[in-house]
């Protein structure tokens, strides 16, 4: 998208940053409302509509010739993707057993990361042929999940139809303190891990140069992808409500160890890769863990609403590049990783605070 906005509309790096940040923020905010409404309707149909909106956004971008419309369409794409992701989690929670949920979510996260790994280089190759090819390919690829969901996904009972469902009331979200702490924890965790590649590249450009930054990113991204693809399912399947506290604590330790490793990696690419591997283990523990925490507190019939509220935590990843830039220009470069260490410790503390809260959703929704 960065290349497209630069080539088609001649936007500079600063304007592209504002445009993409605006689109991401708009997408997240609107996805919250649409995600909450998903509990009132059949989740299968909701996922199909989200995919259709996703595809329409990609089809429309090459057809319009106005940068504002492009940004709005990109916001639509992000909103549709976020809604689909949220409703998919809710469908897992509604239709799978407790022992199966984390395994399937970990498998989903693994496949998702394969897509994130393959997508950028493939998109770059397509851009070399035609600036619009990545958008057409994205629209075509979205047809596959459309067919898969239509054929193999069973209809999910809406909140109002479920026998054991709680009374659907969005105000419950505002009164659930556990949800508040878990969402704040997710915000800080995504601030630390959600945009770590761009964060590292910013850091290296300050302490070295853009050439070495490219080498570092070329090392840490494949390491991150390999660790996630190879270990995510194995780690996620072992996560249960009984052991979640010590395992999430272990994940926090891996995050901290990886960040300390980044501080002392210097110009050694091997140490950058090793630190990225340690850091990524924290990521693959936190991803299914945060899902399980929300699933455990969400009342029946309000799973999508709770996952939508938690998705606000991804704003942390959106804030990271801006915050990293401010830190790197006002403080010593190593301070960036110290701030990230403090953030993940606070994320862990807020998570524990949420775990200690006695479940109150039954009393609220009865």
Where are these regions (language model features)?
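Residue-level signature of mid-helix packing/kink "hotspots" within the transmembrane helices
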Residues: 24-32, 116-117, 225-233, 317-322
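Cytoplasmic helix-loop-helix junction between adjacent transmembrane helices
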Residues: 75-112
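Symmetry-related core transmembrane helices of the 12-TM Major Facilitator Superfamily/SLC fold
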Residues: 134-151, 337-352
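Juxtamembrane intracellular "pre-TM" segments in multi-pass secondary transporters
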Residues: 156-184
């Amino acid at each position: 998208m960065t290349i497209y906005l630069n080539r088609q509309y001649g936007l500079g790096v600063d304007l592209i940053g504002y445009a993409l940040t605006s689109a991401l923020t708009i997408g997240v905010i609107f996805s919250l409302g649409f995600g909450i409404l998903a509990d009132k309707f059949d989740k299968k149909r909701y996922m199909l509509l989200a995919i259709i909106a996703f595809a329409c956004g990609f089809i429309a971008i090459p057809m319009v010739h106005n940068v504002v419309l492009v940004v709005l369409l990109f916001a639509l794409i992000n909103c549709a993707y976020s809604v689909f992701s949220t409703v998919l989690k809710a469908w897992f929670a509604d239709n799978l057993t407790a022992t199966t949920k984390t395994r399937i979510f970990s498998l989903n996260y693994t496949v998702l990361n394969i897509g994130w790994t393959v997508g950028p280089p493939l998109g770059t190759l397509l851009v070399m042929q035609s600036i619009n090819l990545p958008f057409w390919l994205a629209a075509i690829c979205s047809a596959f999940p459309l067919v898969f969901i239509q054929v193999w996904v069973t209809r999910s009972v809406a909140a109002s139809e479920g026998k054991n469902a709680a009374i659907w009331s969005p105000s419950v979200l505002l009164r659930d303190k556990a949800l508040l702490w878990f969402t704040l924890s997710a915000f800080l965790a995504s601030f630390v891990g959600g945009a770590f590649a761009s964060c590292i590249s910013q850091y290296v450009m300050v302490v070295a140069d853009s050439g070495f930054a490219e080498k570092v990113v070329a090392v840490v991204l494949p390491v991150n992808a390999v660790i996630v693809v190879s270990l995510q399912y194995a780690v996620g399947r072992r996560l249960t409500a009984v052991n979640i506290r010590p395992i999430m604590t272990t994940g926090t330790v891996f995050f901290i160890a990886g960040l300390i490793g980044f501080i002392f990696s210097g110009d050694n690419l091997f140490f950058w890769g090793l630190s990225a591997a340690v850091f990524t283990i924290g990521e693959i523990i936190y991803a299914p863990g945060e899902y399980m925490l929300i699933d455990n507190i969400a009342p029946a019939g309000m799973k999508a609403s709770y996952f939508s509220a938690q998705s606000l935590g991804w704003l942390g990843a959106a804030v990271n590049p801006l915050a990293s830039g401010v830190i790197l220009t006002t403080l010593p470069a190593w301070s960036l990783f110290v701030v990230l260490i403090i953030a993940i410790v606070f994320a862990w503390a807020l998570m524990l605070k949420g775990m200690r809260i006695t479940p109150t959703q039954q009393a609220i929704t009865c």
